[in-house]
């Protein structure tokens, strides 16, 4: 799947970036 431009919801609010799957958690890289 293409994760570029994915909007990731975090405790700080929605963040746009590339979603990377790390372990069982998803982080956002720019």
Swiss-Prot record:
Cellular localisation: Secreted
Highest taxon of source: Eukaryota
Coiled-coil stretches: none
One CC-aspect GO term: extracellular region
Keyword annotations: Glycoprotein, Secreted
Post-translational modification: Glycosylated.
Record's keyword annotation contains Cytoplasm: no
Role played: Rathke gland secretions may function as pheromones, as predator repellents, or contribute to the maintenance of the turtle shell.
Protein name stated in the entry: Rathke gland glycoprotein
Species this chain originates from: Lepidochelys kempii (Kemp's ridley sea turtle)
């Amino acid at each position: 799947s293409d994760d570029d431009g994915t909007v990731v919801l975090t405790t700080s609010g929605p963040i746009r970036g590339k979603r990377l799957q790390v372990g069982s958690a998803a982080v956002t890289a720019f």
